A protein has these predicted regions:
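Membrane-interface transmembrane helices that cradle and orient dolichyl/undecaprenyl
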Residues: 100-101, 105-106, 141-156
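Start-transfer (signal-anchor) and selected internal transmembrane alpha helices
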Residues: 1-25
Length: 158
């Protein structure tokens, strides 16, 4: 008997595989080919070590995240690139959950996988800066706003 489409379980498995491949590929490739961090990356780490409430050019969230992550897992290029890809994977996950609210499993999977061809989610995603941090923040914010309105629960607004 022929079935059309993929099941929700298969889609979740393929989405998990997609996240794993993306995370490994976009952590290894820049880690093997780039031997120094860009100036924004070094600036965020240096600022984050001070744990100040504000900085000259930017708000403190990103420097705090970078410094906290690198102090926890070690200061090296690999961990910085890994952090930038975790940021992108958080966005992919939020987009996946939101897409599942509207589309069948295969369509939601395609919606997320096709984002790999958008430069901000692939090769530009290796630079973690304030602009790229907004990719995950907007995705998560949009998801929670939708859930708050759809499910009428105050918890999603918090």
């Amino acid at each position: 008997m022929l079935t059309h489409g993929i099941t929700d379980r298969q889609a979740r498995g393929l989405f998990g595989l997609f996240l794993a491949v993306h995370l490994v590929m976009w952590t290894l490739l820049p880690g093997l080919t780039r031997h120094e961090l860009d100036s924004d990356s070094m600036m965020h780490f240096a600022w984050g070590q001070e744990w100040m409430g504000s900085y000259n050019l930017h708000p403190p969230l990103l420097p705090w995240i970078v410094a906290g992550f690198l102090q926890t897992f070690g200061v090296n290029n690999w961990n910085y690139v890994l952090l930038s890809q975790i940021n992108i994977c958080v966005a992919f996950t939020a987009i996946w959950v939101l897409a599942r609210q509207f589309f069948r499993p295969a369509q939601a999977l395609a919606a997320v996988c096709l984002l790999e061809f958008v430069p901000y989610y692939s090769f530009l995603g290796i630079r973690l800066n304030h602009t790229s941090l907004l990719i995950s923040l907007w995705a998560v914010g949009t998801l929670f706003a939708y859930l708050a309105v759809q499910r009428r629960r105050l918890i999603y607004w918090l």
